[in-house]
Every structure is written in structure tokens, then in C-alpha cells.
């Protein structure tokens, strides 16, 4: 299939509107609120139902700030020094340039939990357990939004693969990586009102003429938006030119999202020591992310690193080591167990 999803759930004007990406975060926080409220009622482990709203606010801020700073630190440090005359002025705040990083979001949530625990005298490890079991739901919605946006695309796959997807967004990278293929877009750009001679002239000049370069990229984006708006002629014309790819975003939605959530939720049906669920999340997420990255293209400006691994895989390996340490420390601690959610277990904290 040729990807033709519009990133806007509701486009109000131009680039202003309600995006699926924003809705995915909202859905993640709403689901987290509902589930944490339910757990707080059953477990009675120090977080009252009345406190859940404030806690979710802390977690949301930690997720957003940590996710963005994580991307800038791990994948785009040049954004710290990038300033523009237009809003939002600073590259760090321009979330449309690179987006968010899940590893950074995890760090942000940890800091948010520690701050909340200190202010409201709640067990910090219990808070980490709560976000560990609910966080994957947000990851699920986020990865679905990644797919709708046509970002974080998968690696090339066999054209006969039944789930193969072709992303028109690939053509935006052609000027810098596969310029020779630009001339093949003649029948495509003609479907959006750009003539053959005009397009070939832009292709000839874009390397040294800034105006031609801007117009060329504007035409490429026009093609993508036209396909998203239902231009079947452009969609059919571009299909043979695109590389079939794994729907890695959907793989991640299932693996990093649903699979981890179901496992941790099932695991917490019985009493566990504070931090046990969080440590399990760190370990499992690291493993699943390493596997998922085998189907996902690395960031173009970073590429593959040592041993043929991606930046995300190396970060996940480091995360796995941290998870092992946390598991050993937290499970050996002489702490009270937190009740599980399954009926029949005591709502009081039990000593092991």
C-alpha cells in the first residue's frame, strides 16, 4: 500500500489544526489517569484518588520536556545552537524538527515521579511502578501517530511482504541522498500542476540556486499533501518509484506498547515490592526496542554506529544494564510489598 494518511485529524487552516500526534499524547494521558485511578482505589498504597490528577500533570510535563530534551541531547545537539526569527525561535522548542525521544521521555518521567514523591510524601518507587504499567499505553498511541505521520519509517523489505508500506515522505530525502531519482518524478509532479520542463529545470538548478531549491522542496511537499488529500492519480504515479518498507511503527506499537502493557499488568495482579514493576519495564522495553530497531531505519543524520547498531539500540543496551542493577537493588531491599490489583489480595502492605 502507498501511505496516504493525513497527519491532521482536523485541519483548520494551512499548517494549523489538530494533529493525530497531539491526540495520541492526550489519549495516553487520559488512559493513564483512568488506570492509575483504578489502581489507586484497589491498592491504597499512598496515592489517593484525589492526588491522581496532580500526579498525571507532573508525569505529562516530565514526558514532554524529557522527550524533547532527550531527542536534542541524543539525536540532534545542534538544535541547542539553532535560532530563527520566527516562532518558536529556538531549535529546542521546534518540536517539528526531530520530534521526541522515548528514552528521554522515560528519564523525564522518572524525574517527575521523584519530584512528586518528595513534595507529597509518596513512595517514589510506587509512582515509578504506576507509570511503568501505564506508560506503554501512551507508547502504543504514539507509535500509531508515528505511522500516520509517515515518520520513523521501516527498513526496506521484499515487495511481496504482505504488510509492506510505501511512504511518499521518502521523496523529501531524495535531493540530499538520491538526487538522480528526482527526474523520475516528472509524471508525478505533473499530477499536481508542475510541468515537465519546469521540474527538470528545478532539478538542474537546486544544488546552487537557493530559490530553485526552495521551490523544489515545496513541490515535493505539495506532492505528499496532494496524496494525503486524495489525489489518486499522483498516488498511482508515485507507487512504482517508492521503496516498500516494514511498517516498523506498527511493530513498535504492538511490541513497545500493547505487549509490554499486558505483561506488566498481568504481573502486577499479585503483591510486588516497590520498584519491581518499574525494573521489569526497563528490562523488557530495552529488549523489545533492540528488536524493533532491526525493522526501523536509523536517523538519516546519524546512521548505523558501532557493530552495525543504531543509536536507539545502544541506548537500549545501556538501559538494560541499568534495569538489571535496579532489579537487584530494589528486590533485595527490605521493603513492604504493594498489593496487586487482583481481588482477594490484602490491601495492606505486607512484609516479605
Curated annotation (Swiss-Prot):
It is a multi-pass membrane protein. Its main location: membrane. Pathway: Protein modification; lipoprotein biosynthesis (diacylglyceryl transfer). A 1,2-diacyl-sn-glycero-3-phospho-(1'-sn-glycerol) binds at residue 143. It is found in: Cell inner membrane. One of its GO terms (biological process) is lipoprotein biosynthetic process. It holds the Pfam family LGT. It is an enzyme of class 2 (transferase). The chain crosses the membrane at residues 20-40, 55-75, 97-117, 122-142, 248-268, 275-295, 314-334. GO terms for molecular function: phosphatidylglycerol-prolipoprotein diacylglyceryl transferase activity. GO terms for cellular component: plasma membrane. It comes from the Bacteria. Its EC number is 2.5.1.145. Keywords: Cell inner membrane, Cell membrane, Membrane, Transferase, Transmembrane, Transmembrane helix. Belongs to the Lgt family. Catalyzes the transfer of the diacylglyceryl group from phosphatidylglycerol to the sulfhydryl group of the N-terminal cysteine of a prolipoprotein, the first step in the formation of mature lipoproteins. This is Phosphatidylglycerol--prolipoprotein diacylglyceryl transferase.
Amino acid at each position: 500500500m502507498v501511505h496516504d494518511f493525513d497527519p491532521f485529524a482536523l485541519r483548520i487552516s494551512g499548517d494549523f489544526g489538530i494533529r493525530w500526534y497531539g491526540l495520541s499524547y492526550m489519549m495516553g494521558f487520559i488512559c493513564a489517569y483512568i488506570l492509575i485511578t483504578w489502581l489507586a482505589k484497589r491498592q491504597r498504597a499512598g496515592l489517593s484518588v484525589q492526588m491522581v490528577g496532580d500526579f498525571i500533570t507532573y508525569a505529562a510535563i516530565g514526558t514532554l520536556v524529557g522527550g524533547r530534551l532527550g531527542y536534542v541531547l541524543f539525536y540532534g545537539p545542534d538544535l541547542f545552537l539553532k535560532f530563527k526569527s520566527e516562532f518558536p525561535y529556538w531549535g529546542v522548542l521546534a518540536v517539528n524538527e526531530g520530534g521526541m525521544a522515548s528514552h528521554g521521555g522515560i528519564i523525564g518521567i522518572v524525574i517527575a515521579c521523584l519530584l512528586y514523591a518528595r513534595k507529597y510524601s509518596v513512595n517514589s518507587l510506587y509512582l515509578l511502578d504506576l507509570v511503568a504499567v501505564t506508560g506503554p499505553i501512551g507508547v502504543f498511541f504514539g507509535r500509531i501517530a508515528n505511522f500516520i505521520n509517515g515518520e520513523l519509517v521501516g527498513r526496506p523489505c521484499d515487495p511481496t511482504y504482505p504488510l509492506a508500506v510505501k511512504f511518499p515522505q521518502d521523496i523529501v530525502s531524495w535531493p540530499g541522498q538520491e538526487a538522480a531519482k528526482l527526474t523520475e518524478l516528472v509524471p508525478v509532479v505533473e499530477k499536481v500542476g508542475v510541468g515537465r520542463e519546469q521540474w527538470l529545470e528545478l532539478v538542474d538548478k537546486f544544488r546552487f540556486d537557493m530559490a530553485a531549491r526552495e521551490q523544489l522542496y515545496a513541490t515535493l511537499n505539495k506532492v505528499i499533501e496532494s496524496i494525503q488529500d486524495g489525489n489518486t492519480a499522483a498516488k498511482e504515479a508515485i507507487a512504482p518509484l517508492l521503496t516498500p518498507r516494514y511498517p516498523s511503527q506498527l511493530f513498535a506499537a504492538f511490541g513497545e506498547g500493547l505487549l509490554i502493557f499486558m505483561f506488566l499488568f498481568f504481573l502486577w495482579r499479585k503483591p510486588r515490592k516497590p520498584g519491581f514493576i518499574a525494573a521489569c519495564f526497563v528490562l523488557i522495553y530495552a529488549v523489545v526496542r533492540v528488536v524493533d530497531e532491526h525493522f526501523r531505519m536509523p536517523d538519516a543524520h546519524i546512521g548505523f554506529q558501532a557493530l552495525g547498531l543504531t543509536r536507539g539500540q545502544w541506548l537500549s543496551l545501556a538501559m538494560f544494564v541499568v534495569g538489571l542493577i535496579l532489579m537487584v537493588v530494589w528486590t533485595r531491599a527490605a521493603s513492604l510489598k504493594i498489593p496487586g490489583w487482583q481481588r482477594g489480595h490484602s490491601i495492606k502492605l505486607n512484609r516479605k
